[in-house]
């Protein structure tokens, strides 16, 4: 096909992967990317964590908050008056789906469910953790050799570094203490180590965190020919995917600045708008596979904060090492992440994904004079991520008779943990207590976060090996029964996982984009 047009719905790391891979393999193509939210940074899709000014960073995060956003409330047709939020407050840069106002979703069993509405999507706000899936987390119908290559390419696109902060002696001391506690129980290659992160280490020891901008790469470089073939339209809402039978013809879009609607013809449409809004768009377009919205999973998370014990730490690090760590941290005080360690998922010994993040301060205020409020050796914030095993009953459904705040069929989420998850949560909580005692003293006891807190929502457009009604997409991310409709994101992951899913979803997107490129006549395919 000569000069094909590809429409991409969503500007996060997954949509950006499709744009990059397709234009690199089909350079005569035209890619138009649509984003309902605003552009936050001069470089489209950059991580807001790279913004040095705290006020500017706060402004960027607020602009991402959809119905709660300030600067764009009225231009988006959202009342400027206060919206009453539900029981939980969304994380900075995100907005609750069930926010308590007119047109909010119904998610009492999944109350912390949230989204980001901005150029770069969650990639503008994420923690940049990029562990690889392992054991049963991997997709069984993708061959191991191909999977390893896909993960390798995903790491390149995201600028993954496996040893960020590895030169931190404080971080090394934390690893040593955890290894003493758990090392003998863990399989070879899956012991305590540094957490792979997406970003580029800087000479001063800080990190320039990766967002969708690094995935887009040459598409944002005005000197690159590929940039001439790429268009990003922010504040543009895709209302529907238009169909002619089982073939997509394009998308109906609304300019949120003017309210005007138009049709954009496309030879291929990629829907990568997140695990709730992508199936919502499909539903609104009349694309309604039996599995759409079902098999919702995330990661139950148990968290705590521990004050590091000076005597324990001094077994592996000196006061001079601590002073050097604090001096380095002073160079980037607005970024709370320093040394980041982990214990990866493994089976059957350790079906959890553990992150241990060092910080010289707690993530919450402490009254002066209270125990450990001024702990010289600092703190670690620890989290055990666990599996949610897929069930058809865990689902987001859509009501054609009740519009949400944007005029789409409104969402309702039904979700429950079972005895299977409860058992793993209990085991993880006990392990977290062991980890805390090995490092110091708890200043925040282990606690299970509300459902939806992980932001790692999966399964609602799951891929499958056969079209048997239990999946939405084929092994190359094409919606079953449609010739040129492709979906992307964490929603495609069909397995129970414990690790941060971004790297896995980018790898899946690379596979899907290569398949599309081949069918469009790519010379590289």
Per-segment meaning from a language model:
Residues 4-33:
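N-terminal Rossmann-like FAD-binding beta1-loop-alpha1 element of flavoenzymes
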Residues 231-234, 239-244, 411-496, 502:
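A glycine-rich dinucleotide-binding beta-alpha-beta segment and adjacent secondary-structure elements
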Residues 495-516:
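A conserved FAD-binding loop/helix module that cradles the flavin
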Residues 24-32, 36-62, 241, 252-326, ...:
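Glycine-rich loop(s) and the adjacent beta-strand/alpha-helix scaffold that form part
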Residues 90-115, 289-292, 301-411, 417-419, ...:
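FAD cofactor-binding and catalytic pocket of flavoenzymes
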Residues 38-79, 116-128:
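Conserved N-terminal glycine-rich FAD pyrophosphate-binding loop of Rossmann-like flavoproteins
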Residues 71-74, 79-91, 105-108, 112, ...:
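Conserved redox-cofactor binding core of oxidoreductases
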């Amino acid at each position: 096909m000569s000069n094909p047009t590809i429409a991409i719905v969503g500007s996060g790391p997954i949509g950006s992967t499709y744009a990059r891979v397709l234009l690199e393999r089909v350079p005569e193509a035209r890619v138009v990317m649509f984003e309902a939210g605003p552009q936050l940074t001069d470089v489209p899709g950059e991580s807001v964590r790279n913004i040095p000014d705290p006020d500017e960073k706060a402004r960027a995060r607020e602009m991402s908050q959809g119905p709660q956003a300030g600067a764009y409330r009225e231009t988006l047709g959202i009342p400027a008056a206060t919206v009453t939020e539900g029981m939980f407050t969304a994380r900075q840069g995100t907005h609750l789906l069930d926010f308590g106002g007119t047109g909010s979703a119904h998610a009492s069993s999944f109350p912390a469910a949230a989204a980001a509405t901005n150029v770069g999507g969650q990639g503008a706000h994420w923690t940049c953790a990029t562990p690889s899936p392992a054991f049963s987390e991997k997709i069984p119908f993708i061959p191991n050799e191909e999977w390893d290559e896909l993960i390798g390419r995903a790491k390149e696109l995201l600028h993954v570094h496996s040893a960020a902060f590895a030169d931190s002696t404080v971080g090394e001391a934390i690893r040593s203490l955890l290894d003493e506690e758990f090392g003998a129980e863990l399989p070879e290659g899956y012991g305590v180590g540094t957490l792979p992160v997406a970003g580029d280490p800087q000479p001063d020891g800080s990190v320039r965190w990766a967002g969708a901008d690094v995935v887009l790469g040459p598409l944002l470089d005005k000197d690159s020919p590929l940039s001439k073939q790429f268009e990003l339209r922010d504040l543009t809402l895709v209302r529907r995917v238009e169909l002619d039978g089982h073939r997509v013809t394009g998308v109906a879009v609304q300019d949120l600045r003017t309210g005007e609607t138009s049709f954009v013809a496309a030879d291929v449409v990629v829907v990568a708008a997140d695990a709730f809004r992508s199936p919502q768009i499909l539903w609104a377009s009349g694309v309604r596979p039996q599995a759409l919205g079902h098999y919702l999973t995330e990661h139950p998370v148990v968290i705590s904060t521990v004050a590091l014990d000076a005597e324990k730490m001094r077994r592996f690090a000196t006061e001079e090492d601590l002073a050097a760590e604090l001096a380095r941290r002073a160079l980037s005080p607005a970024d709370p992440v320093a040394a980041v360690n982990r214990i990866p998922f493994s089976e059957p010994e350790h079906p959890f994904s553990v992150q241990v993040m060092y910080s010289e301060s707690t993530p919450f205020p402490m009254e002066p004079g209270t125990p450990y409020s001024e702990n010289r050796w600092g703190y670690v914030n620890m989290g055990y991520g666990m599996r949610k095993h897929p069930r058809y009953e865990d689902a987001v459904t859509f009501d054609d008779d009740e519009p949400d705040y944007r005029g789409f069929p409104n969402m309702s989420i039904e979700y429950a943990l079972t005895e299977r998850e409860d058992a793993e949560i209990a085991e993880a909580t006990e392990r977290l207590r062991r980890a805390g005692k090995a490092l110091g003293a708890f200043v925040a006891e282990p606690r299970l976060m509300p459902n939806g807190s992980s932001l790692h929502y999966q399964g609602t457009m799951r891929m499958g090996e056969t079209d048997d009604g239990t999946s939405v997409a084929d092994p190359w991310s094409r919606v079953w029964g449609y010739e040129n409709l492709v979906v992307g994101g964490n929603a495609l992951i069909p397995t129970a996982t414990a690790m941060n899913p971004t790297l896995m979803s980018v790898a899946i997107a690379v596979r899907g984009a290569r398949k599309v490129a081949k069918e469009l006549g790519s010379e590289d395919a």
